[in-house]
């Protein structure tokens, strides 16, 4: 489970044995959210939230959107074409 980004006490990871569509997991202490990276022209979106605050989710969406190209590149490196 490579950590791709870190911000404000949260880690953004991509599980190597995960499934499509492309998404990341945002992990904090005893909490996690799954965020879809979205297709071309789409913004990342929350899929599942297990304990992150609204503020943490909002921050995660901004950071993931800002780093979407890097995250898609890493997804492809781990899983092949998206």
What are these regions (language model features)?
Residues 1-22:
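Short, charged/polar N-terminal "headpieces" of proteins
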Residues 11, 28-30, 73, 79:
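Intrinsically disordered, low-complexity segments enriched in polar/charged small residues
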């Amino acid at each position: 489970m490579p950590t791709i980004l870190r911000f404000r006490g949260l880690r953004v990871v991509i599980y190597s044995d995960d499934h499509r569509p492309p998404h990341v997991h945002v992990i904090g202490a005893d909490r996690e959210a799954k965020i879809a990276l979205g297709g071309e022209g789409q913004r990342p979106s929350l899929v599942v939230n297990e304990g992150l605050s609204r503020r943490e989710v909002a921050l995660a969406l901004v950071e993931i959107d800002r780093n979407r190209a890097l995250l898609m590149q890493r997804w492809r490196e781990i899983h092949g074409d998206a």
